Amino acid sequence: MIIHVFTSESVSEGHPDKIADQISDAILDAILAKDPLARVACETFVKTGMVLVGGEITTSAWVDVETITREVIKDIGYNSSDMGFDWASCSVLSAIGKQSLDIAQGVDNRETKILGAGDQGLMFGYASRETDVCMPAPIAYSHRLMARQAELRKNNKLPWLRPDGKCQLTLKYDQGKPVAIDTIVFSTQHAPEISHKDLVEAVREEIIKPVLPEEWLSAATRYYINPTGRFVIGGPLGDCGLTGRKIIVDTYGGMARHGGGCFSGKDPSKVDRSGAYAARHVAKNLVAAGIAEKCEIQVSYAIGVAEPTSISVDTFGTGHLRNNVIIDLIKTHFDLTPQGIIDHHDLFSPIYRQTAAYGHYGRDGLPWERLDKVAALAKAL
């Protein structure tokens, strides 16, 4: 038996950075719903009593930035300054300009079809057979724990829960397969009247146990639930939040590499977003087709150039075909130009706010999660 451990974390939809991500993507969705060819790079900053929305947006549409911002904060559940934020009373400031003409000339042609990538950059996609959604287990189950926290908060089963929170899972692996949970760290914002003892019991029984596989839990599993003892001050009252600061939470929890570019607030002409989604689609279909047990894809782009400047693959010794053969399969079955990616996944649709909490991968209903190339790829085996 060869045991190693790996840790990933997730954060709640009420975490300050995730508030910012959701506002940025809600504004993006509102613009794309009216103007699918808009160019959007929307950044959000949140702090006590204040939201600042900035960036570069070129569009024929008008959207009410203030109303959208307040609706997002309300949906998350910040309705009182006592818990760190109040959707009704916070100030909303806007500092939005237009996309640089120097960038636009490399991205668009006269028919407003995308010619080239919106920037240079490198992106990674990853998939493995660890879970039913082809995601690493630590990040997949961390997201599920945080989603469970929000569910019990919003349905009032645990009415003392508040929006901010985060969790961290350390899993034990035996020869590359998850076999047990070593450590659970779970911190949730709460109302002041709940005792620490009652909180710990409720989190363990109502959030953790229903989500995590029973066979992975044992007497050896370590639990750290609100280990400081108190988490009443949270949200933007406790920390400022900024779009794009949770890129590892958004992707693979550190199990795969990351190119550095964030997703939220960016329209699909930005390959930081669309290129990463396409790389995930490639990796997931390769794994599902049986070509590898796990697979990491890297693509890179040059600004104004349509074709990727490079495609590479790593199957970590689990591949059933040589890497050069896999790359040829990718080039044959996947159009990785920005326009090809956008067309295949219908990325001009307003689908992005849902991705801004609980991860961009391993979820139903997202076009880059489809297994639509498996049959064609499997023929190569």
Swiss-Prot record:
The keyword Cell membrane does not apply. One of its GO terms (molecular function) is magnesium ion binding. L-methionine binds at E56, Q99, D239, K270. Residues 99-109 are annotated as: Flexible loop. Keywords: ATP-binding, Cytoplasm, Magnesium, Metal-binding, Nucleotide-binding, One-carbon metabolism, Potassium, Transferase. Binds 2 divalent ions per subunit. GO terms for biological process: one-carbon metabolic process; S-adenosylmethionine biosynthetic process. Its main location: cytoplasm. Pfam families: S-AdoMet_synt_C (PF02773), S-AdoMet_synt_M (PF02772), S-AdoMet_synt_N (PF00438). Pathway: Amino-acid biosynthesis; S-adenosyl-L-methionine biosynthesis; S-adenosyl-L-methionine from L-methionine: step 1/1. ATP binds at H15, D164, G165, K166, R230, F231, D239, R245, K246, K266. It catalyses: L-methionine + ATP + H2O = S-adenosyl-L-methionine + phosphate + diphosphate. It is found in: Cytoplasm. The keyword Isomerase does not apply. Its EC number is 2.5.1.6. Homotetramer; dimer of dimers. Catalyzes the formation of S-adenosylmethionine (AdoMet) from methionine and ATP. The overall synthetic reaction is composed of two sequential steps, AdoMet formation and the subsequent tripolyphosphate hydrolysis which occurs prior to release of AdoMet from the enzyme. This is S-adenosylmethionine synthase. It comes from Legionella jeonii.
